[in-house]
């Protein structure tokens, strides 16, 4: 009887222990749109769950900075996905951000070069009792012509 109690207590201790965080492979962030209102990105990640139990993803938070110093903002996107135990799960999340300042685009368009960006984010897992935030970072460039099209109004008869 004592051994049975010890086995039950050990099982409860393991079941209540905090899960190990998954590893996040930052695959890519693809700019899907740039216009006068804001910017859209598809964020692709690969999350590997090292635990013996499934983990639930609640949301993804992304913070975008352009050209090293232009803070576009932060957005949180609900994303309910299950990370299967002991497996890698691909995640693809669409993120839309409005320009925090209307003057953000003009200096970028006038710079005469592609615009580097960095997305710093967190993948939030768990529920109300236990929660884990796993950070990730993605970077890339936005082609100058995409910035120009967004920054300048169309002029009839002029092609860019």
Please report, for each region that a protein language model flagged, where it lies by residue.
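Sec-dependent bacterial lipoprotein signal peptides
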Residues: 1-14
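Bacterial Sec signal peptide processing site at the extreme N-terminus
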Residues: 15-32
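Short, solvent-exposed loop/turn segments enriched in Ser/Thr/Gly
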Residues: 37-44
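Asparagine-centered strand-capping/turn motif at beta-strand->loop junctions
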Residues: 47-51
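Short acidic, flexible loop segments centered on an aromatic residue
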Residues: 52-70
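Intrinsically disordered, low-complexity Pro/Gly/Ser/Thr-rich segments with frequent PxxP/GP/PP motifs
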Residues: 67-103
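Terminal connector regions
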Residues: 99-149
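Acidic, serine/threonine- and proline-rich intrinsically disordered appendage/tail regions
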Residues: 144-160
């Amino acid at each position: 009887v004592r051994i049975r109690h010890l086995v039950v207590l050990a099982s409860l201790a393991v079941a209540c222990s905090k899960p190990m965080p998954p590893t996040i492979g930052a695959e890519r962030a693809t700019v899907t749109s740039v216009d006068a209102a804001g910017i859209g990105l598809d964020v692709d990640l690969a999350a590997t769950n090292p635990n013996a139990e499934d983990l639930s993803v609640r949301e993804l938070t992304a913070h975008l900075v352009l050209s090293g110093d232009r803070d576009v903002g932060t957005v949180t996107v609900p994303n309910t996905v299950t990370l299967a135990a002991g497996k890698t799960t691909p995640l693809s999340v669409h993120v839309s951000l409005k320009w925090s300042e209307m003057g953000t685009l003009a200096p970028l368009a006038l710079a005469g070069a592609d615009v580097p960006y960095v997305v710093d984010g967190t993948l939030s897992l768990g529920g109300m009792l236990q929660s884990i935030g796993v950070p990730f970072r993605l970077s890339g460039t936005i082609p100058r012509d995409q910035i120009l099209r967004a920054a300048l109004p169309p002029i009839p008869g002029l092609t860019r």
